[in-house]
Amino acid sequence: MANMNRALAAIADPTRRQVFERLADGPRSVGDLAQGLPVSRPAVSQHLKVLKAAGLVSDRAEGARRIYEIDPHGLGALRAWLDQFWGDALAAFKAEAEKDPS
C-alpha cells in the first residue's frame, strides 16, 4: 500500500501528470519532456525523480542523455488497484439494472 500511496501522490501533481501523459506517447528525454511545459528542465527532472520513486517511470542511459518511459509494472499495479473499485461499481450497476421493476 505504501507504493500505491506514493504512486497516487506522484500523479496528484498537475505538472507530473502532464509529464506522465507525454511519456504515454513513448520514451523521451528530459529536454523533450520540458518543451512546452511552464517549468524548467531541472524542475522536470525533479518531477521525473518523484515518478521514478513511485515506480511509474523508468530510465536508461542513451549516450549523455537519460531517456524516460512509463514503467509497465508500476502502471499495472496502479491499474489493478483502481480496477477493484471499477469492478465493484460495475457489479452494483449490474445488480441495480437486473432488479425486478415491480
Identify the role of each PLM range.
Residues 1-3, 21, 75-102:
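Amphipathic alpha-helical dimerization/coiled-coil segments
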Residues 2-40, 65-76:
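N-terminal helix-turn-helix DNA-binding core of bacterial DNA-binding proteins
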Residues 21, 35, 46, 52-53:
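Alpha-helical residues within the helix-turn-helix
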Residues 43:
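Residues in the helix-turn-helix
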Residues 52-63, 69:
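Beta-hairpin "wing" of winged helix-turn-helix
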